[in-house]
Amino acid sequence: MVAAVPPMVSGGLPVIGHLVEMLQNRETLFKRGYAEHGDLFTIKLGPQPVLVITGADHNRQFYTETDKSLNMQDGYTFLKEAIGEVLFTASQETYYNQRPALQEVFKRERMVDYARAMNIEVQRWLDSLGQSGEVDIAQAMMDLAQAVAGRAFIGPDYEAELGAGFWKQYEAIAASLDPVLPPKLPLPKFRRRDQAKKKINATLSALIQKRRDHPERYNDLITTLLTTPLKDGTILPDKDIVTIFMGLIFAGHETTAGQAAWLIALLLQHPDYLRLVQEEIARHVQPAAALDGSMLSRLEHVYWAIDETTRLRPSADTQIRTVEEPIQVGSYEIPAGWRVMVSGATSHHLSEVFSDPERFNPLRFAPEQGEGKNPFAIIGFGGGIHKCSGMNFAKNEMAIITALFFQQFDTELLSRDIRVIMGKGANRVSEVRVRYQRKAGAPRVG
């Protein structure tokens, strides 16, 4: 029997509902909803009713019904104004037309070049640390993720080509994100966003023209997008190349930086597991050797730690869809116009799926335990046809950072109160201050 809509979570305020709590501490909101009502409950964001779902079965429906009864784009209009019509902000037709270009960017053969870029930039960062000192890993990972993206997508001359102000313009765009306010209001942050977009467009348009004039000199993201036919047989116009570049940077660099910082923090907080990681690195990573695909494939404990970090501290802890046609979820009929959200705060902590779910235990992903077999149990990289195209890129980047950092340095975690900072985009991490000492005989390049 189909019942009425799911029950409402407590704590809503007149007019605004749960909006403030959603923006400031959605983890507490979602966990309270689950405690009160189980795996299906309703919150109100202003006048907008939102169904929040928990568990792999409901997550599977969420992802498989996307582009059918669930619309992906309407929930991200604030992002569309910031980065343009690309990836999850694009219309269904545009997304499927662009998809061959996105697949080309992240195909397996290109991962070899990306891994090379990651090795170079990670080692440059490690060399810059000197023999000993202290570093805020959270900020360092933001800077490093920018450098990796620049070298991987633009090439070795990325610093000169992008210019010193590129990332400042990007930060102005990221700071403008606001899922509440209409994105075209004449506010200072939206004006700064629009000015930054113009400057970035000018920079990238010049790079595109250089590659049009001398295609033989380049083999990077832009040349890939200039030469890869779309589904309809056409080639991307320049404005769409700029948009895709911005979309990839936006979707990847902040989320990867946050996950990488949490990964290092969690390993330092759990020295017994860190010892397993260090032993694995010592066995499989030769001093002064670049990590290639063969080497990375042997770092099981590192990748299990990455998966456990995604479970416990996801940068993307929720995603949203709009109900276009009435849909039955469990015993409820969800009307058109509602929104639906997945919740890492609850799905990732189900005791029937993950043993001792609050504990950092990467070994849960080992084959003999197999807690990560259901692809819809964890939502950190999305799911279904829209699953993050750059997932392997991000995981490899985190693995290379982890392997080289702990290979070359003895470390001590100084920060004691490391917290998730929830924002209007990806979740961030508070300061992760680490004291380090270069190991005797550790390679130092340059």
Per-region residue spans from a language model:
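Conserved cytochrome P450 K-helix/beta-meander segment immediately N-terminal to the heme-binding cysteine loop
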Residues: V342-Q369
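Cytochrome P450 catalytic-core helices
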Residues: T255-L274, Q278-E280, N392-Q407
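Cytochrome P450 I-helix active-site segment
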Residues: V5-V15, A115, N119, E216-T223, ...
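Cytochrome P450 heme-thiolate monooxygenase catalytic core
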Residues: M1-P7, V15, F30, N71-F78, ...
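Conserved cytochrome P450 K-helix E-x-x-R motif and the immediately C-terminal K′/meander segment
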Residues: I16-G38, A206, A289-G330, V445
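N-terminal membrane-proximal hinge/A-helix region immediately C-terminal to the signal-anchor transmembrane segment
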Residues: M1-E93, N97, R116-R124, A377
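Cytochrome P450 proximal C-terminal region
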Residues: Y34, V122, F166-Q169, I173, ...
